[in-house]
């Protein structure tokens, strides 16, 4: 009997119909292994060849120096083993290829966002929430004060000064309204006197028998119209000064008073909240609320004290300015009226010069900017 050749049980080598070894699978494995390895790692070219099955070694691995340019990386390769592919993928994710061609390994970790990055929508929502809470507290405080249930902080001296200022403002507005009415009526009278003087002058030229009489009346009406224009200038100056005092200076002070009153309401509202929390139990849940309420109360107390000082200072300066302005304007008004009805033209003109009042000549337009230059 012919002796059978020993066979290796570890591997079976297929043979083609011509009796040659079928190494197509080995070439396919070598090609896949080359493609799966990362390019540019400085590895030598590896070739795996198989010898006869009757040899003592299963195969010989021949290694030589790598020659030629490295192949460009392929986008995706099917690895012969899933485990090897997963390991290569993990190694590839930690490799960074710089411009020089060398690979450096970096550590991957969780991404931490900076605290400075804020959402504008969340900021607006927070502002709306604070405004709504503050409005609710202030509204509740106002209703409680009107119903007589809540307490309010009162500065008796400052409140009295504010009440006097508001009352004086109403009276000054009434004087201003009456002075404007007088100015309108005086303007109509001056206009009528001027027309009447022109009519008398025309009749003086056409009526020879009454030439002198019409002439006297024409001169009188023209003189009255001239003096009326002078008085009208003084009254308009008085109106402008009082209007500035009432609608600008006093109004600015009253705006500060309104801010002071708003600060007072906020102060009382947060003071009431703090008092209610202090009357309740003190435990781990209420202590943070009490501390926050104490902080808000202190902030609004400082704001209230600041606004109260601002109102006191403005009221003091307003009183000094009001006395000075009204003193000059009342003297002007009295002297102009007295000189006009006394028929003292020189005294009337002297009064206007004393207060640096320039009258606009009727029928004369204002000079252009070229003439002023």
Swiss-Prot record:
All residue ranges annotated as the AH domain in the record: 153-353
One Gene Ontology MF term: phosphatidylinositol-4-phosphate binding
Modified residues (N-acetylalanine): 2
Gene3D superfamilies: Arfaptin homology (AH) domain/BAR domain (1.20.1270.60)
Key words of the record: Acetylation, Golgi apparatus, Membrane, Phosphoprotein
Listed GO biological process terms: intracellular protein transport; negative regulation of retrograde transport, endosome to Golgi; regulation of Arp2/3 complex-mediated actin nucleation; regulation of protein secretion
Protein name per its UniProtKB record: Arfaptin-1
Biological source species: Homo sapiens (Human)
Lineage: Eukaryota, Metazoa, Chordata, Craniata, Vertebrata
Gene name in the database record: ARFIP1
